[in-house]
Amino acid sequence: MQQRTPPDKLIDPDGQVHRGRFTASVPRINGPEYDYRTPMGRPAPARQRRFHYKQFQYFGLVSDELLLGCALADTAWLGVAFFYWFEPATGALHEYSWRSPLARQPHLSQSPVNGVSRFRQKGVDIRMGYESRTDGLRKSLAVELPELQLQAYMDEPADFDPMSICTRTGINGWTYANKVAGLPVQGRLTRAGQTRQLDDLNAGGHHDFSAGYMRRRTFWNWACLSGHTDGHWLGLNVSCGVNETSFTENCFWRDNELIKVDLVDFDYDGDDLMRPWRIRSGDARVDLVFEPLNRHREKLNLVLFASNFHQIFGRFTGVLRDARGRETRVDGLHGFVEEQYAQW
């Protein structure tokens, strides 16, 4: 599909959503201004407009020595934040989760290019920042816990091509996703009086900014890697279950160049997610095996809200191919896969 120049706002003055794949990030995701309808075509009542709109943002870091992930989500029914870090050499996993009824926290930025998202409760302060600069865009993460402080950021050069896409979701909804991977991460992590410079880890970063009127019952698989190999910076973002109507978010980056990918199949054992996964695209541009090392889980089953979420971290091996058939070997790069079910 031909890319479109992004509008200033995702929802136009008539309440209609701009769909398609955009050449850059849409500056403002004004989702609540959408003319949301019932499946029968009538204007949706205010309660549905409020509780059917979902937002989540994620910042991940990947390296041989350290992996970490942080997410902020506003499901309207519940606000959620999680943060974890994992050391492959020792197998040590440190996890933190927080919840806020009726999503009183977090407060999420409506822009993937300028703004701050924040989750704050007693003993925790998390901020995700978005800052347009003369030389590109900076995305940052700051985490303040009693025993840990993190400051991290990744810079998108002005010529970087993010995956910026908005697709239909059911008869009356849509999903906007802004994805980035394969960029170096800088900053520092301080714990127990010891400071680790992220610059020294040769770490790669991933970021996800998603919002929309998503399906009431949603399932997806997702895979991401980010790192430096064979003289190239690589990033991968592929999924199934969301953003597949008319076009997809599937792609990988090599040295800041976005290479589009066809539909992707996730082949794995649903009874044992810690067994190897096979991830292949229909156009053969992605052919990877994922070996799990550990995982972060969130499970909640309430009357109106349910979540069964597995984010698994491990190593990818295989090959990525561009449109001209040039291969980049992937040999043990760290990354993530997900299995997610949500009733929200």
Model-found features: residue ranges?
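Structured soluble/peripheral alpha/beta segments that form catalytic or ligand/cofactor-binding pockets
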Residues: M1-W344
